[in-house]
Amino acid sequence: MGQKSNPIGLRLKIINTWDSLWYANKDYTTKLHEDFLLRKFIKKAFYHASISKVVIARKVDVIMVNVYSAKPGVIIGKKGADIDKVKQKIVKMINNNIELNIIEVKKPELKAILIAENIAQQLERRVSFRRAMKRSVQNCLKIGAKGIKVSCAGRLGGAEIARTEWYKEGSVPLHTFRANIDYGFSEAKTIYGIIGVKVWVYLGETKSSNE
C-alpha cells in the first residue's frame, strides 16, 4: 500500500538540502526551538511579503538568517527602517547576534508554498475555490512548470459535509526521486472552518546533489 510522504523531506540529500544549516553537540533542542520561533516570527511579521522559505545558518558568534521573499520591499521598508526593527526584536527574542539577508524570489508563481498561501488568501476573501485553484494552476504552467497538483479539503463553499477537491494539470511523478517537486501547505481560516490547501509543483528532472 502506497504511503504519503512530504516530497521535500523524501528528497533531502538527493536534490534538496536542509533549511537549518548547523551542527550542535549540546543544546540541540534549544537551537531547534530557536529556529522554530524565528521562522514563526518572520512569517507572522511579514505575512503579506510572500516568504517562500527561511534558511538559518549558525556560526560561532552570529546567526545568519536568509529570508527568501517575492516582495523584498515589504520587508525592508523605507530606507531599511522595517528591517532594523525586526533585527532588534529578534536579538531580544533569542539573545544572539543576527545577520539578516533578504533574497528576492524571481518566479513566485513556481513556489508551491506561495501558491498555497495565495489560494488560502483568496478563499478567506470568499473567492470560489474552483476559480482560485484553476487560476493558480494556469499561472504556474504559463511560467514554465511541467505539472501541478492542488487539493483543497474542508467545508468547501460552506457545504455541511467536508470533502476534498483536486485539480491537476501536466505530470507530477511523486515516485521519481530525481524529479524536482516543490510542495507547499497552507490553511484558510473561513467562517465555516479551516480549509487545508496542498500544492505539488513539478519543475522537471534534476541531477542528484551527490553526482
Swiss-Prot record:
Cellular component, GO, one term: cytosolic small ribosomal subunit
Keyword terms, alphabetized: Ribonucleoprotein, Ribosomal protein, RNA-binding, rRNA-binding
Short name of any one Pfam family annotated for the protein: KH_2
Listed InterPro entries: KH_dom, KH_dom-like_a/b, KH_dom_type_2, KH_sf_prok-type, Ribosomal_S3_C_sf, Ribosomal_uS3_bac-typ, Ribosomal_uS3_C, Ribosomal_uS3_CS
Domain of life (superkingdom): Bacteria
GO biological process: translation
GO MF term (any one): mRNA binding
Family: Belongs to the universal ribosomal protein uS3 family.
NCBIfam families registered for this protein in UniProt: rpsC_bact
PANTHER family: 30S/40S RIBOSOMAL PROTEIN S3 (PTHR11760), SMALL RIBOSOMAL SUBUNIT PROTEIN US3C (PTHR11760:SF19)
Protein name from the UniProt record: Small ribosomal subunit protein uS3
